[in-house]
Amino acid sequence: MVESKVVVPESVLKKRKREEEWALEKKQNVEAAKKKNAENRKLIFKRAEQYSKEYAEKEKELISLKREAKLKGGFYVDPEAKLLFIIRIRGINAIDPKTKKILQLLRLRQIFNGVFLKVNKATMNMLRRVEPYVTYGFPNLKSVKELIYKRGYGKLNHQRIALTDNSIVEQALGKHGIICTEDLIHEILTVGPHFKEANNFLWPFQLKAPLGGLKKKRNHYVEGGDAGNRENFINELIRRMN
């Protein structure tokens, strides 16, 4: 007696083939992702070392220049700063529409919001218009690092996402060569070529009320108050509010 062959329908064979192809593709994708992650980890570590060396050399150079100026009986003048950090210190009471609009353009919608800005003529003109409502100055490396690591949120798909993973930074800014938090810090601190994209990715910082409170919000900093330009002393205020 001849045994009858079981004929597998063509649709089943096609489905089986598709499933095998999908399984192979999935396996290849997982392996590619693992390889990319390993390469990224090496690159991130290398860049972090490079940035650390760069910051240390700049600090060493600054100390040397200050010492040299002192020996010559003069004093060292810092090169013009490129980066500002602005904090809104007053609410909406008695605020005129134009001032309100500028504060919105600066992304300072709430009291104790803080943002980074590039120093240029347009920025300084806007700050003068809203000076009674803000305080600002030149953030140092420690301030930029602590703000981004402690209070940093990014904008990804129109959502506010905590910067808990380098992959979040890479998703948003990888096309600009910014693949980790240390890259982001470096781009902001040095006001790099993709500062605009990096800064727009950062959500405005929500700071806490400063320890010890503020003195006189309506008065200028140089008059013993809090508003306006406090230059390098912004770093002391950032510590109290972070």
Swiss-Prot record:
Q: Which GO terms describe its cellular component?
A: chloroplast; cytosolic large ribosomal subunit; cytosolic ribosome; mitochondrion; plant-type cell wall; plant-type vacuole; vacuole
Show the PROSITE patterns listed in the entry: RIBOSOMAL_L30
Q: Which GO terms describe its biological process?
A: maturation of LSU-rRNA from tricistronic rRNA transcript (SSU-rRNA, 5.8S rRNA, LSU-rRNA)
- Which InterPro entries does this entry report, sorted A to Z? Ribo_uL30_ferredoxin-like_sf (IPR036919), Ribosomal_uL30 (IPR039699), Ribosomal_uL30_CS (IPR018038), Ribosomal_uL30_euk (IPR005998), Ribosomal_uL30_euk_arc (IPR035808), Ribosomal_uL30_ferredoxin-like (IPR016082), Ribosomal_uL30_N_euk (IPR012988)
Which keywords does this chain's UniProt record carry?
Ribonucleoprotein, Ribosomal protein
Q: Which Pfam families match?
A: Ribosomal_L30 (PF00327), Ribosomal_L30_N (PF08079)
Molecular function in Gene Ontology: mRNA binding; structural constituent of ribosome
Asked if the record carries the keyword Ribonucleoprotein, the reply is: yes
NCBIfam families assigned: uL30_euk (TIGR01310)
Which family does the entry's similarity section mention? Belongs to the universal ribosomal protein uL30 family.
Provide the protein name: Large ribosomal subunit protein uL30y
Organism, per UniProt? Arabidopsis thaliana (Mouse-ear cress)
Gene name of the encoded protein:
RPL7B
